[in-house]
């Protein structure tokens, strides 16, 4: 039952001074270092800090902002931080909030990626990753189940998921084509069968009041958050310049076929396809980074996902690992500077991956608000989310194949890896253990197996 705040509480909120930009900066910096647990955990942390504890924003406005971010491609937790920062402190507030959500993870991943590339063959490190690989397979299966249980609400959506699995597994169709087809089916389904394609997985109305907030239910929309065509045009021009300038410099310095140039182009496309979160776009990253460009091996891709799971920030930051390894093994600054090449590649990949996400919030936030909950906009997302389930299942099979048959089907079946994968699945599904706990336990199990084998 919702409790109404007392008049004294309302008066206290009204007299409270606004949060300064520096105070907000310190909070967003802290959040960047503690944002473990994937999007659900990160959103829970923000809710606890911003809604319940600090009262910077009300429950209703928080969920309203989260629903906007759910409609956009990109990591919803990072976009939510950007949105709230923008709502509180204009454009710079959004840039600071979203940037600090990502930067700690980038620095940590650059360091871990270097340790992985430089010392990955050391027995202890190799043993830890031997146990982590089957755990990642179980984690991806769990992600498919989690998203599917929320998204596949009827037979039509199940059919889309099955078709997307066949399309990528049997027909090897490109991931962007699958997303486009699912969006078209969702749009048509929304017109013909609106009840079957209503947006699912969103967040409902607020049911709890934690007292008055600085940005409360009835607080008017700030002037800077109101939609204006000139403002939208200006931000689109700035965004285009922020993309074209580094791409132009890369093309001029390394040529269009250069590693860094191709990374910038590839991850720009990947950023526009992240409906459903990082697990949804990983098959596309695999198709390009592993299959087409050869920036890293299938085994390295699995290890990179494990590193992404154990660091703060969005899981899509696994792209920084892909960039680092690709730059490290294709050193464009000479054979004596592989770390510099890897660090630059990881930073550029992060820039091109997250630039669209910032623009969607800063330029499109007011526009998205004006179209929120209209079926013609949300039905395509429903179709895409259903397709994502089939794509993630394919990713799980891909990981499982490389983990359980490391030498291919003609080689031996890896029974210890299979047992570790089953144990990880039981821990996730039956005992509801966290991802980091599962990875840690499986890493120790893998180390034990590796040492026993000698």
For the regions a language model picked out, list residue spans one by one.
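Multi-pass membrane proteins that catalyze or facilitate reactions on polyprenyl-/lipid-phosphate substrates
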Residues: 1-72, 83-311, 315-454
């Amino acid at each position: 039952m919702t409790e109404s705040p007392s008049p004294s509480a309302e008066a206290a909120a009204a007299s409270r001074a606004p949060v300064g930009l520096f105070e907000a900066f310190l909070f967003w910096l802290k959040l960047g270092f503690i944002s473990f647990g994937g999007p659900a955990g990160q959103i829970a942390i923000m809710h606890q800090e911003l809604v319940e504890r600090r009262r910077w924003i009300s429950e209703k406005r928080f969920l309203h902002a989260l629903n906007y971010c759910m409609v956009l491609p990109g990591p919803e937790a990072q976009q939510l931080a950007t949105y709230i920062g923008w709502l509180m402190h204009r454009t710079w507030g959004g840039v600071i909030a979203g940037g600090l959500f990502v930067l700690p993870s980038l620095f940590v991943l650059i360091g871990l990626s270097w340790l992985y590339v430089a010392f990955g063959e050391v027995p202890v490190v190799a043993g830890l990753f031997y146990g982590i690989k089957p755990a990642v397979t179980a984690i991806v299966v769990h992600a498919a189940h989690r998203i599917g249980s929320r998204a596949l609400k009827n037979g039509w959506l199940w059919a889309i998921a099955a078709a997307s699995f066949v399309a990528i597994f049997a027909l090897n169709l490109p991931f962007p084509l699958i997303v486009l087809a699912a969006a078209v089916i969702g749009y048509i389904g929304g017109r013909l069968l609106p009840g079957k394609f209503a947006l699912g997985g969103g967040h409902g109305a607020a049911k709890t009041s934690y007292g008055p907030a600085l940005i409360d239910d009835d607080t008017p929309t700030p002037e800077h958050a109101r939609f204006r065509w000139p403002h939208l045009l200006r931000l689109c021009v700035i965004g285009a310049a922020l993309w074209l300038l580094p791409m132009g410099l890369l093309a001029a310095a390394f040529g269009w076929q250069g590693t860094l140039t191709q990374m910038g182009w590839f991850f720009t496309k990947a950023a526009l396809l992240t409906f459903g979160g990082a697990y949804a776009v990983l098959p596309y990253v695999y198709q390009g980074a592993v299959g087409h460009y050869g920036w890293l091996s299938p085994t390295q891709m699995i290890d990179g996902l494990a590193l992404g799971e154990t660091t703060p920030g969005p899981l899509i930051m696994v792209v920084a690992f892909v960039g680092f390894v690709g730059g490290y093994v294709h050193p464009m600054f000479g054979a004596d500077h592989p770390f510099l090449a890897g660090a630059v590649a990881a930073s550029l990949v992060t820039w091109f991956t997250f630039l669209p996400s910032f623009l969607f919030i800063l330029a499109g936030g007011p526009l998205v608000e004006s179209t929120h909950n209209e079926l013609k906009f949300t039905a395509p997302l429903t179709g895409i989310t259903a397709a994502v389930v089939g794509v993630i299942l394919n990713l799980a099979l891909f990981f499982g194949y490389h983990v359980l048959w490391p030498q291919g089907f003609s080689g031996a079946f890896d029974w210890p890896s299979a047992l570790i994968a089953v144990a990880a699945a039981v821990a996730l599904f039956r005992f509801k253990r966290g991802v980091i706990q599962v990875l840690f336990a499986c890493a120790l199990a893998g180390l034990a197996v590796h040492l026993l084998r000698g």
